[in-house]
């Protein structure tokens, strides 16, 4: 073989080696992109799966906070009637509960009674309603209101 032919073969061999290296690099890049898409898909599925449980937990916490705030508003209204020595009312009107100076919004997951009013006499005793019932997705929360002394008791009834 002559020198020019050897040089050409060497040049072709070097070119083929470089092309193989580029093909391998391209395959690695494609594999890395495929891995990235796979990981992104798995993370998306996990995020969507967890968002439902987070949402239900948030709703449960929101319900608990609402009932604690309702009980506090009940006691505040009772204290106001004693302090002012006047009859005071706590009005339940669907999505809003109010005592004239304070308002409490009922969350979307809870159905509150509408058109009911709890009236406290000058001594702070309840002189109107015997019970108030709220409906939730898990059942009912009923407040037993003791006439005369103004005490309140929460009773939870779950759906079967």
Curated annotation (Swiss-Prot):
One of its GO terms (biological process) is establishment of competence for transformation. The keyword Membrane applies. This is Competence protein ComGD. Keywords: Cell membrane, Competence, Fimbrium, Membrane, Transmembrane, Transmembrane helix. Required for formation of the type IV-like pilus (T4P) that plays a role in transformation. Transformation pili are dynamically extended and retracted, perhaps thereby promoting DNA uptake and transformation. Involved in transformation. Required for DNA binding. It is found in: Cell membrane; Cell surface; Fimbrium. It is a single-pass membrane protein. The transformation pili are flexible filaments, consisting mainly of the major pilin ComGC and smaller amounts of the minor pilins, including at least ComGD, ComGF and ComGG, and perhaps ComGE. Interacts with ComGE. Interacts with ComGF. Interacts with ComGG. It comes from Streptococcus pneumoniae (strain ATCC BAA-255 / R6). The gene is comGD.
């Amino acid at each position: 073989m002559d020198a020019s032919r050897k040089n050409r073969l060497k040049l072709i061999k070097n070119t083929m080696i470089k092309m193989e290296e580029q093909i391998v690099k391209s395959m690695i890049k494609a594999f890395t992109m495929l891995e990235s898409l796979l990981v992104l898909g798995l993370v998306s599925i996990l995020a969507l799966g967890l968002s439902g449980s987070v949402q239900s937990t948030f709703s449960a916490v929101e319900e608990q906070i609402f009932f604690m705030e309702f009980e506090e508003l009940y006691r505040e209204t009772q204290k106001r009637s004693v302090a002012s020595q006047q009859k005071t009312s706590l009005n339940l009107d669907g999505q809003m509960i109010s005592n004239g100076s304070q308002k409490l919004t009922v969350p979307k997951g809870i159905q509150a009674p509408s058109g009911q009013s709890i009236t406290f006499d000058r001594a702070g005793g309840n002189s109107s309603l015997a019970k108030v019932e709220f409906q939730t997705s898990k059942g009912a929360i009923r407040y037993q209101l003791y006439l005369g002394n103004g005490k309140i008791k929460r009773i939870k009834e779950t759906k079967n």
